């Protein structure tokens, strides 16, 4: 039924008194209460808040996708102006009508493109399907339009990409495909739900700029859901702050950042890690935590030395890791991925060395190679004077007691069929360290040490939040009293407050137990806060390494400067210079089998500060 007289001029979407609830144990649990907002054509409205605040369920309610998940939605008004300028009440549309609205008039970009794309269809088929459904195009016409959309989202060699499957693309490329699919029918409203949270800073910057450019070209209203205030400052016109299912503050981006009224908004802004906040400081510093009572209160800094002088606990020399690629009629190895090329570094007890770089730079492969989770083709890995790379499997298992791993996704790291108590006890059983009674006491102590309760040991992983699951993984890593912990993107996808809690916990554990961390991350603001030293990786090689203060305050390599320049700044008045929106993905690190890559030569530019010499930077400078 048309409602053209009820939608204010300029608005493309209007919502009044939206209420969302779910049934749990025969009780109605409210997720969103009395939420009202509007969106103008060509405007970006950022909806911000922590996990559980109701951001994503609001988006799903607008798309009418909650009913399938058992959501109970009530709303006085939910009006959408379609591309045809017809105004419809979304809550009155049938399932068949909504299938025509979704994609054609409203589109959504989800946080994780790999789970949003169908793994058994090519990229081209998936984009073309939406075009054929909503524009009545033939298959050939749809594929031509799909190629045009890939060009529009600045994907190079679009014709080739059309025939590839999602797993064959990088994370940033998959997210661009999702954007192309969402925009293929030129919707009136685009909902972007955390589309850049787990992306590298350079890819994130490209995606944000891409959305702004396409929004301007299509005069499209955008709802951008995020918990990253730096992203909000860069992309938003207006901001809606949500807390525990309610809108607590709304206003222009300048009002929210420069004159926040609600204590939660002030606390959210105070908790944002600011790049450059560690200027002049030598040691890691705790994050301030979100507090409604004391929103501006800073956590006490850690200004004490934890690094132990003497011999390094871990020494890596000329590490090489390559992965074979097979092709041809005989399925022979013809090419190799040069994931890690002649990487060398030391790690001292009580030190945090951060490995930073974009996806594909070799950070995670380096971390996995240290534990021989992937086999290396060359180099030496020496732990406490003993070579790891030549150990037999039996001796390697004993050594793994001293080196533990924390993975990015805690839910995937925990067995859903085991209680968390059993998950934490498992490494103790494998190594035969403690009998049952003592192991149970150890589990209770570990849970308390990471801020959980001993009775949580009887629960299962799905009963915990993301931050709590990451604490459980940390407790399991601590069970064996390791000397080194490798944390691979351990806080990348966590909310700002949960991320601060986990980083503070890691710093406390380092202070108390002298643990050395190899911290793998692309979040430069977090790296600045936690690190003693930083190593920058590019195409499998370290191009800059040194004390955190030297690398951040005086970056020498152009790639390091690029990473720092791409970090979103939580200040609307500081707009990042406009980029040329060409593909900025890493050049290929795939080479013919047997082909050698010249190793970078590092030059000392300061105490402990080494940078790739100019002649070693040809690949970067050529881009």
UniProtKB/Swiss-Prot annotation:
It is a peripheral membrane protein. It is an enzyme of class 7 (translocase). GO terms for biological process: peptide transport; transmembrane transport. It is found in: Cell inner membrane. Residues 15-269, 314-564 form the ABC transporter domain. GO terms for cellular component: plasma membrane. CDD domains: ABC_NikE_OppD_transporters (cd03257). It catalyses: glutathione(out) + ATP + H2O = glutathione(in) + ADP + phosphate + H(+). Its EC number is 7.4.2.10. ATP binds at residues 49-56, 357-364. The keyword Cell wall biogenesis/degradation does not apply. Keywords: ATP-binding, Cell inner membrane, Cell membrane, Hydrolase, Membrane, Nucleotide-binding, Repeat, Translocase, Transport. The keyword Repeat applies. Belongs to the ABC transporter superfamily. Glutathione importer (TC 3.A.1.5.11) family. This is Glutathione import ATP-binding protein GsiA. The lineage of its organism: Bacteria, Pseudomonadati, Pseudomonadota, Gammaproteobacteria, Enterobacterales.
